[in-house]
């Protein structure tokens, strides 16, 4: 059985999708780590009976408290699914090429600090792009600059808004993220 930990800061829709995709497979979500005590992912973790670890910025950034909690679960892969904090270099060193992220644009465009969710979608629409998409990549010490694993794109029309783009991106995430996790962990 392969073991994954999911890090999330928001609603947790990708985490739940991953859970359902792997329900009868040899991949198990052994824990969800969350940095936001008001995040929707907490309710999802409780409902799905997935162990939840809540942590604060100091424990994550300046101590090895979270590192030890992660190590206790013996993960084969750490999946960032809407997690908004930069991963400390010491954690990347503990899990080289074992931390992946999904980003809601075709990197290298619209990546970097502060570029997540609605901020990305608004920037894409304001730039009048004709396509957007998702990038799944390994995590390194720089925001959104790790080696790419996979990209998928969607076409945009002049009628698209940040909201309609978000819906298109969400469909791409649901369709591709679990399959790329499966390929990456094998």
What is the role of each PLM region?
Residues 1-186:
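One-carbon transfer enzymes
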């Amino acid at each position: 059985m392969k073991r994954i930990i999911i890090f999330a800061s928001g609603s947790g829709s990708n985490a739940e999708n991953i859970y359902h995709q792997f329900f009868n497979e040899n991949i198990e979500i052994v824990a969800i780590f969350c940095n936001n005590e008001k995040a929707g992912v907490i309710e999802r973790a409780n409902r799905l009976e997935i162990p939840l670890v809540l942590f604060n910025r100091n424990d994550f950034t300046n101590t090895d408290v979270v590192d030890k909690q992660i190590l206790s679960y013996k993960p084969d892969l750490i999946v960032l699914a809407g997690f908004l904090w930069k991963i400390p270099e010491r954690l990347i060193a503990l899990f080289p090429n074992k931390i992946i992220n999904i980003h809601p644009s075709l990197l290298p465009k619209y990546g970097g600090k502060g570029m997540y969710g609605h901020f990305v979608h608004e920037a894409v629409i304001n730039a009048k792009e004709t396509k957007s998409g998702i990038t799944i990549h390994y995590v390194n010490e720089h925001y959104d600059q790790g080696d790419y694993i996979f990209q998928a794109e969607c076409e945009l029309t002049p009628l698209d808004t940040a909201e309609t783009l978000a819906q298109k991106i969400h469909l791409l995430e649901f369709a591709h993220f679990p399959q790329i996790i499966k390929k990456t962990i094998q």
